[in-house]
Regions:
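Conserved C-terminal beta-signal and adjacent last beta-strands/turns
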Residues: 183-185, 221-225, 530-629
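Outer-membrane beta-barrel signature, preferentially recognizing the C-terminal barrel domain
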Residues: 249-279, 317-320, 414-469, 476-504, ...
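Short acidic/polar hinge/loop motifs at secondary-structure boundaries
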Residues: 110-137, 431, 482
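Structural signature of Gram-negative outer-membrane beta-barrels, strongest in the C-terminal barrel
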Residues: 234, 278, 291, 333-339, ...
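Extracytoplasmic beta-strand/coil segments of soluble accessory domains associated
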Residues: 70, 74-114, 131
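Transmembrane beta-barrel wall of Gram-negative outer-membrane proteins
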Residues: 174-201, 206-241, 250, 263-288, ...
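Gram-negative outer-membrane beta-barrel transporters
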Residues: 339, 372-378, 466-468, 488-564, ...
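N-terminal periplasmic accessory domains that precede
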Residues: 69-72, 90-94, 103-106, 120-126, ...
Length: 629
């Protein structure tokens, strides 16, 4: 019966793909390669970098009506998104088998990972004011230091341009979902400005399964002489989340969760950044930034009625990170760029009534880019990072890209080392911490090729990657108090393939597919890494049958994943999303356009859990209206 249901599901998905095609908007056949900044810390055409890089644009958010950042990242090859249940629940990201602790997440270059847990909470990042998201896969510690073993996700906010413009959007859906958003921006003389406010709430599928997220964002810039610019960015959000899954001691969570009726969490985040950049002469550009990240998280779980042996739990965790960086790039003609950077980082965390600790880090990095004949591009560099607790780490990375322009071919490859710093919890939390911990380390390499065919209407890519992880930090049981501790005692390996294809099938029809195969193994246990599927597929089509109408379909498939020795595997799943935009009104007075929007996630009502014990939502529809001024 399960097989028949899956066959019926795939058949229905096939019909939907034929009827409602998905993925990026149809464009002219001639495309311009994007310019990225995350791969080299300065603006560089993507074709000139040897690392695997993907870009999610502001246009993607408008086309697919992503309500959250994690939904926008699901279609990127090599990435795995794991949400623990419904909207607002904890959401993490892994890249090529590297855990969430080993992936660096930035907003305008500012680290937004918690110093205590070591993870970035994607549900706390609003999709407001996003111009693009650049995703680097592979080790990036030579540029970004600790916690960039698996890659970097850099969310870049939009700068105001041109006359004032604004967008107002309202959406409603099942599960009592309501989403409201307003944004605007523009430019006046030497000033540029952009702002946004949003609200997202939903009641979820269980009792005590609701969430409410509110966010404010703003960016103010000023143009200065000598090709200079100064910008101040502020982002605030608060997420109130009900947690319906009851913790069960000493065993894995059941597939069907036990409901906790009064467990709740609140998270409030503030990110502030002041950045200045200048290029007074063609051969030198300089950029400086100071920033501050704050997060306050409260957790409450009173005694549940009806349980004889239940116990209450409460916590209040406050963290702060202050950063300063200064980067200088020196250009020698068109063939050489040397980049030198200095960074300082101060981190502190407090679990009220438990512990309070702080660390500081100083870093120096150097990178050299060489360009030969407009075809061969070499990049190499290193970083020295000194941590106040565990000492100094040095990481290196090198890459190359070679263009065969007459064939539309790009060959690329690279290798590098990385490390993940122990968190404040690892080092200082009473009862299990270990101040003698060393960083997790890695060495990774990759080779790949990209091909354009049919006057660039077809775009293909293939990458092979290999990662070796050492000194992994793990919990171990002890025969004496405190009975549990963290130690450097594990090793792991991942390798695999990322393949992608995108085609402009017609002028109004674009299709894409990408596939990731990941083979992983934990040394000594002869088992794959937990929650890392062997196979992932993303399929999409976007169709514009009328000038006013755009339709899309996206299909996400993941194979089963190893959970642990007790329960074995968490089964795989296939999720189908569809939607579209209809422009109901064109220019009328101040109105630029009025659009009707729709997005339906999990159309086939697939029952699955990205994290075992935390069931994902069934079919979720969100429809609304968007007005642009």
């Amino acid at each position: 019966m399960a097989m028949e249901a899956r066959i019926r599901g795939w058949a229905a998905a096939g019909l939907l793909l034929a009827a409602f095609p998905p993925f990026a908007k149809a464009q002219e056949s001639k495309r311009v390669d994007p310019v990225v900044v995350t791969a080299t810390r300065i603006e560089t055409p993507a074709a000139e970098v040897g690392v695997a890089v993907s870009v999610v644009t502001e246009e993607d958010f408008r086309t697919y009506h992503y309500a959250t950042v994690d939904e926008a990242l699901r279609s990127v090859p090599g990435l795995e998104i794991r949400r623990s249940g419904s909207l607002g629940k904890t959401t993490s990201i892994t890249i090529r088998g590297a855990t969430a602790n080993q992936v660096q997440v930035l907003v305008d270059g500012v680290r937004v990972k918690s110093p205590t847990t070591g993870q970035a909470e994607l549900s706390d990042i609003s999709p407001d004011l996003i111009e693009r998201i650049e995703i680097l896969r592979g080790p990036q510690s030579a540029l970004y230091g600790a916690d960039a073993i698996g890659g970097v996700v850099n969310i870049i906010t939009r700068r105001g341009t041109g006359p004032f413009s604004a967008t107002v959007q309202q959406e409603v859906g099942n599960y009592d979902t309501l989403r409201s958003r307003v944004s605007g921006g523009g430019q006046w003389k030497i000033l540029d400005y952009a702002f946004a406010a949003s609200h997202l709430e939903s009641n979820g599928q269980f009792k005590n399964d609701g969430s409410e997220a509110r966010a404010l964002s703003g960016r103010l810039g000023v143009a200065l002489p000598w090709d200079s610019h100064l910008a101040f960015v502020a982002r605030w959000n608060r997420t109130d989340t009900d947690l319906p899954v009851k913790f069960v001691c000493c065993g894995p969570l059941a597939v069907e969760p036990l409901i906790d009726v009064n467990q709740q969490q609140q998270s409030e985040t503030l990110v502030l950044s002041l950045e200045g950049k200048t290029r007074p002469v063609p051969w030198w550009e300089s950029r400086g930034r100071i920033s501050r990240f704050e997060n306050s998280m409260g957790f409450q779980d009173p005694v549940d009625p009806g349980y004889a042996f239940d116990f209450p739990a409460f916590s209040q965790i406050n963290v702060e990170r202050r950063e300063a960086e200064w980067i200088n790039a020196f250009h020698l003609g068109k063939w050489s760029t040397s980049t030198v950077g200095l960074e300082y980082r101060h981190e502190e965390g407090e679990n009220k009534g438990v512990f309070r600790s702080r660390t500081h880090t100083q870093s120096l990095f150097f990178e050299e880019q060489l360009r030969f004949f407009g075809r061969l591009f070499l990049t190499g560099g290193f970083r020295v990072e000194d941590h106040s607790v565990f000492g100094t780490e040095t990481t290196e990375r090198g890459s190359l890209a070679y263009l065969i322009k007459g064939w539309g071919t790009r060959l690329r490859g690279g290798a590098g080392s990385g490390f993940r710093a122990p968190t404040l919890n690892d080092l200082f939390y009473p009862g299990f911490s270990n101040p003698a911990l060393k960083p997790e380390t890695s060495f990774s390499w990759e080779v790949g090729a990209d091909q354009k065919l049919w006057q660039e209407r077809i775009r293909l890519g293939l990458t092979y990657f290999h990662n070796d992880f050492d000194n992994l930090i793990r919990f171990v049981m002890l025969p004496v108090p405190p009975f549990v501790a963290v130690m450097n005692l594990a090793r792991a390996r991942t390798s695999g393939i990322e393949a992608m294809a995108e085609a402009d099938l017609l002028k109004n029809l674009v299709g894409s597919v990408n596939y990731t195969y990941t083979d992983s193994e934990t040394s000594g246990r002869n088992r794959p890494l937990a929650r890392e599927p062997h196979h992932r597929w993303n399929v999409g089509l976007t169709w514009e049958p009328l000038a006013r109408l755009s339709l899309f379909t996206q299909v996400h498939t993941a194979s089963r994943q190893f959970e642990d020795e007790t329960v074995g595997y968490n089964r795989g799943h296939t999720r189908v999303d569809v939607g579209g935009t209809y422009r109901a009104l064109d220019r009328y007075g101040w109105l630029q356009a009025v659009e009707l929007t729709a997005r339906i996630q999990n159309l086939l009502d697939e029952g699955y859990a990205e994290v075992r014990g935390f069931p994902a939502l069934g079919t979720q529809a969100l429809v609304g209206v968007r007005a642009r001024f």
